[in-house]
């Protein structure tokens, strides 16, 4: 009798609701239509909810993907479920029946290879690379502009200093030359009139006396 009860329980557990797809280590693209398949017996609840789970991650994944799915259907297609790529995912069938609540069946672990996740990741990487390149270009332009402005300011300062020095030197030399020439000319002009009349006067008097003397002797 005890053996019969044990055998009956074993047969019942084997014949209970069982998920046949996805299979172990199967690659599943959840961004596209994915069909979940199962087998059932008449004693199973008439409906259940479908969850996508991943317990070996942090935080764990426990996402509701379908509600009140009829057990008698034998399959259900989900479409466009968002999930990160990776392994260790499972499908759980969860019952709401008050007489049989909890997990009814659990699939084997499979891998998620969603093209949507890959595309999003690639787009993000591309946007980051573009932003970095733009920042780098902007920084380079700023440095170039700063360097150019500094060089221009330096050149202007040098030119101003050179012109200032040249102007000062020219003015000094001009003033010195002009002053020297003016002083020389003034001195020459002043001394010549003073010296010439005196010389002429002294030469004229002796000459007159000499001529008168010669005339007197001749007579």
Swiss-Prot record:
Q: Which InterPro entries match?
A: GPI-anchor_Adhesion_Reg, Kre9/Knh1-like_N
Pro-peptide positions on chain: 199-219
Please report which positions carry a covalently bound lipid of kind GPI-like-anchor amidated asparagine: 198
Q: Where are the transmembrane segments?
A: none
What keywords would UniProt list here? Cell membrane, Glycoprotein, GPI-anchor, Lipoprotein, Membrane, Signal
Q: Is-annotated flag, keyword ATP-binding?
A: no
Give the main location: membrane
Which Gene Ontology cellular component terms are annotated?
Answer: plasma membrane; side of membrane
Q: Which residues are glycosylated?
A: 85
Q: How is it modified after translation?
A: The GPI-like anchor contains a phosphoceramide lipid group. The anchor position has not been determined.
Low complexity compositional bias: what residue ranges? 114-144
Source domain of life is Eukaryota
Stated membrane topology is: Lipid-anchor; GPI-anchor
Listed as disulfide-bonded, the cysteine pairs are none
Q: Where does the secretion signal sit in this chain?
A: 1-16
Task: Kindly list the places in or outside the cell where this protein is found, as annotated in its UniProt entry.
Answer: Cell membrane
The segment annotated Disordered runs over 107-144, 160-205
Provide the family line: Belongs to the UPF0619 family.
Q: Identify this protein by name.
A: UPF0619 GPI-anchored membrane protein AFUA_3G00880
Name the source organism.
Aspergillus fumigatus (strain ATCC MYA-4609 / CBS 101355 / FGSC A1100 / Af293) (Neosartorya fumigata)
Q: What is the lineage of its organism?
A: Eukaryota, Fungi, Dikarya, Ascomycota, Pezizomycotina
């Amino acid at each position: 009798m005890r053996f019969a009860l044990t055998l009956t329980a074993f047969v019942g557990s084997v014949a209970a609701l069982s998920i046949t797809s996805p299979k172990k280590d199967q690659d599943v693209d959840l961004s596209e239509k994915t069909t979940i398949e199962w087998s059932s017996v008449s004693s199973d609840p008439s409906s259940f909810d479908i969850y996508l789970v991943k317990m070996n991650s942090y935080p764990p994944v426990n996402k509701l993907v379908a509600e009140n799915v009829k057990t008698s259907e034998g399959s259900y297609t989900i479409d466009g479920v968002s999930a990160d790529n990776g392994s260790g995912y499972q499908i759980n069938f969860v019952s709401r029946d008050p007489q049989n609540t909890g997990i009814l069946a659990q699939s084997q672990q499979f891998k998620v290879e969603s093209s949507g996740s890959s595309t999003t990741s690639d787009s993000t990487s591309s946007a980051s690379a573009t932003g970095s390149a733009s920042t780098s270009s902007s920084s380079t332009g700023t440095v170039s502009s700063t360097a150019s402005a500094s060089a221009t300011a330096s050149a202007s300062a040098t030119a101003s200093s050179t012109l200032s020095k040249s102007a000062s030197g020219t003015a000094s030399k001009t003033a010195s030359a002009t002053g020297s020439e003016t002083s020389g000319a003034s001195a020459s002009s002043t001394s010549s009139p003073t010296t010439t009349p005196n010389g002429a006067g002294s030469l004229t008097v002796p000459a007159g006396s000499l001529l008168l003397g010669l005339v007197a002797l001749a007579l």
